[in-house]
Amino acid sequence: MPRISEIAASVGLLLLIGVISVDGLVKEGDYQNSLYQQNLESNSATGATASFPFLMPNVSPQTPDLYLCTPIKVDPTTTYYIVGFNPNATMNTAHHMLLYGCGEPGTSKTTWNCGEMNRASQEESASPCGPHSNSQIVYAWARDAQKLNLPEGVGFKVGKNSPIKYLVLQVHYAHIDKFKDGSTDDSGVFLDYTEEPRKKLAGTLLLGTDGQIPAMKTEHLETACEVNEQKVLHPFAYRVHTHGLGKVVSGYRVRTNSDGEQEWLQLGKRDPLTPQMFYNTSNTDPIIEGDKIAVRCTMQSTRHRTTKIGPTNEDEMCNFYLMYYVDHGETLNMKFCFSQGAPYYFWSNPDSGLHNIPHIEASTL
């Protein structure tokens, strides 16, 4: 099995410090919106759900495939529960967006390029989250995905009693033609939140790979990790992400039965070039200690060159986001599950610990 590593999917954005105050998520300075402030203050008093606009501060990217980041600092005196995500973006502007939960942001600057996967860039860059700061993915969006509401009673805990002290928004601007005339962008997400405690805490596990796809061939990029924590996960939503070569992305819970045979329960399977929103999982059966979570991306190349995993449209990605909740206690310490990918790691490797693999099902819709 591959080691768990905190490899964040390629990242980037311009940064704007804001504050989630005891009266609600209110940004400081010129970006503060009095209407939002009024709504948040009144809703906070009643314990109802309020909405906070976490948006790019009218940025104008001038470099193709630029990743920009912007943060908000969560009020450390109050615990909040995020219960919904309403994107404010279109695929004509933003290739994708990620929302990170961090102990500290990747830099003390108010704005930065967070595209650290882009080795070709000469610009100074930093990760979305600081080192050893409990980096985790909370939410992801691409290809005109619609609003996501969490199940009743479920929420992402941030603030006082959570390791998430900052939220960092990342936007990947793949194409910048529309900004050449000085136009600006405020892509982002409206966060629905409440101070009313949620017993069911939400978490997101990001599974993905490194690797490469040979020219003019179909390749499988695969990963799998074992749950080694005494927790019961209730999966409820999943999201897939590739670039242009992705054909099918599938995810499974793998459990060994009393006869020693592995049973593969499908969690989700999609064409990654359809709207990359969070969909209901195929099954909601619990995931327990000792289970494995396995993901395959079936990639088909018509290019006359090798395509590597990387941040740009000329590269590829293989990502599967699994959203779950726990009934008791905290969410998984494991936030990421990555492998080396092809040509080094495959489910069928003798040391993977996997057998009874549904090869055909995992690669067909």
UniProtKB/Swiss-Prot annotation:
Tissue: Expressed in the central nervous system (CNS) in a small number of CNS neurons (approximately a few hundred). Expression is present both in cell bodies and within neuropil regions. It is strongly expressed in neuroendocrine neurons (at protein level).
Hydrolase recorded as keyword: no
InterPro entries per the UniProt record, alphabetical: Cu2_ascorb_mOase-like_C, Cu2_ascorb_mOase_CS-2, Cu2_ascorb_mOase_N, Cu2_ascorb_mOase_N_sf, Cu2_monoox_C, PHM/PAL, PHM/PNGase_F_dom_sf
Observed phenotype of the null mutant: Death as late embryos with morphological defects that resemble those of animals with mutations in genes of the ecdysone-inducible regulatory circuit. Amidated peptides are largely absent but peptide precursors, a nonamidated neuropeptide, nonpeptide transmitters, and other peptide biosynthetic enzymes are detected.
Assigned EC number: 1.14.17.3
Residue positions the entry lists as glycosylated: N88, N280
Cofactor dependency: Cu(2+)
Subcellular location: Secreted
Reaction catalyzed: a [peptide]-C-terminal glycine + 2 L-ascorbate + O2 = a [peptide]-C-terminal (2S)-2-hydroxyglycine + 2 monodehydro-L-ascorbate radical + H2O
Cofactor mode of binding and number, as noted: Binds 2 copper ions per subunit.
Disulfide bridge positions per record: C69-C114, C102-C129, C297-C318
GO molecular function: copper ion binding; peptidylglycine monooxygenase activity
Primary location recorded for the protein, binned into one broad class: secreted
UniProt binding sites for Cu cation B: H241, H243, M317
SUPFAM superfamilies: PHM/PNGase F
GO biological process: memory; peptide metabolic process; regulation of imaginal disc-derived wing size; response to fungus; sexual reproduction
Activity sensitivity to pH: Optimum pH is 5.0.
Role this protein plays: Monooxygenase that catalyzes an essential reaction in C-terminal alpha-amidation of peptides. Produces an unstable peptidyl(2-hydroxyglycine) intermediate. C-terminal amidation of peptides is required for normal developmental transitions and for biosynthesis of secretory peptides throughout the life.
Family: Belongs to the copper type II ascorbate-dependent monooxygenase family.
Name of the protein described by the UniProt record: Peptidylglycine alpha-hydroxylating monooxygenase
